[in-house]
Amino acid sequence: MIEAILFDVDGTLAETEELHRRAFNETFAALGVDWFWDREEYRELLTTTGGKERIARFLRHQKGDPAPLPIADIHRAKTERFVALMAEGEIALRPGIADLIAEAKRAGIRLAVATTTSLPNVEALCRACFGHPAREIFDVIAAGDMVAEKKPSPDIYRLALRELDVPPERAVALEDSLNGLRAAKGAGLRCIVSPGFYTRHEEFAGADRLLDSFAELGGLAGLDLTAPVA
């Protein structure tokens, strides 16, 4: 029987990436720099995981204003803006997520987050979408800079599994991106993928299931662990 479900956050629990993009752009404007990430550029930047890493990549190639602050400070300001936007209640969980989590809790299945986003972002999402602190929803939260290498490295999933004390063959990961799929499979997990707005163009070879919506799972019954791990 399945013992744990590990969730990515951005694009998986909720469609947050447009709000992240808005937070980046509003932060850039507040800092007085002529940077603006449109959807096409942001989609490309998302192939690099981690907000600080995206800013660094952007700075290596952009020809506009230089960075007004260290990257970590820019990212900190963006996180504060994102948390404020989340508090305005503009984001809802993706279809099927709330029911799956509720059913898993009733069944005694442990829940974890394994994400490259920061802990404050996870907390903001949980308070906005669940009305509770993250620790009241998830047994383990592996986030942000808790590991040295971000997805597609499997490190964040390995950390979550260690904290859960659950072997990968007794757990399943839910993801929305190719980097997330690679991270989950690298940790020995089965992985169910439902692409988000910014990842629908990606190829998901190796996914154990590929869904248009997590609502298609039909709850725990859809977490099929009978097939061997790819």
From Swiss-Prot:
Gene3D superfamilies: HAD superfamily/HAD-like (3.40.50.1000), Putative phosphatase, domain 2 (1.10.150.240). InterPro entries: CbbY-like, HAD-like_sf, HAD-SF_hydro_IA, HAD_sf, PGP-like_dom2. The active site is at 8 (nucleophile), 10 (proton donor). It holds the Pfam family Hydrolase. The keyword Magnesium applies. One of its GO terms (biological process) is xylulose catabolic process. It catalyses: D-xylulose 1,5-bisphosphate + H2O = D-xylulose 5-phosphate + phosphate. GO terms for molecular function: hydrolase activity; magnesium ion binding. SUPFAM superfamilies: HAD-like. It is an enzyme of class 3 (hydrolase). CDD domains: HAD_CbbY-like. It comes from Cereibacter sphaeroides (Rhodobacter sphaeroides). Changing residue 54 to A: 97% decreased catalytic activity with xylulose-1,5-bisphosphate, but no effect on activity with ribulose-1,5-bisphosphate. Substrate binds at residues 8, 17, 50-54, 75-78, 115-121. It comes from the Bacteria. Highly selective xylulose-1,5-bisphosphate (XuBP) phosphatase. Also shows activity towards ribulose-1,5-bisphosphate (RuBP) and fructose-1,6-bisphosphate (FBP), but not towards fructose-6-phosphate (F6P) or ribulose-5-phosphate (Ru5P). Degrades xylulose-1,5-bisphosphate, a potent inhibitor of rubisco produced by the rubisco itself. Its EC number is 3.1.3.-. Its cofactor is Mg(2+). Belongs to the HAD-like hydrolase superfamily. CbbY/CbbZ/Gph/YieH family. Keywords: Hydrolase, Magnesium, Metal-binding. This is Protein CbbY. Mg(2+) binds at residues 8, 10, 176.
